[in-house]
Amino acid sequence: MTEEFETELGNRLLRYAAIDSQSDEDSATTPSTDDQYSMLKLLEKELRDIKAQDIQITDYGVVLATIPGNKKGPTIGFLAHVDTAPQFNAKNVKPRMIKGYNGGDITFPDNPSLILSPKDF
């Protein structure tokens, strides 16, 4: 994988993680929020941009697409969900990647007193 491609994938993941896609337990619709549907539409657009085929969003909020391979081999699938648990605050999230993570504590730039420690998990 080239460094440019790796950077693009990393930036895409960070952008997805920053989207407020919190579920609404009281909703009778699927997806349960407009933000979740917006994320599905973003994924649909990005799949079109990379020339994926057979793109569709199902009534259950699932994006399906085919990305043809560049050589013969087994078919693979990628699965993920777009919702965030309702117990989690999904607003104003500032995701980041820590390259070369050493397994120690992680501090948060906006609140250095907030620490994520492997000892707590």
Predicted regions and their residues:
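Charged, compositionally biased N-terminal leader segments and the immediate start
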Residues: 1-2
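N-terminal capping segment at the start of a domain
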Residues: 6-34
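Active-site metal-coordination/substrate-binding segment of hydrolases
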Residues: 74-121
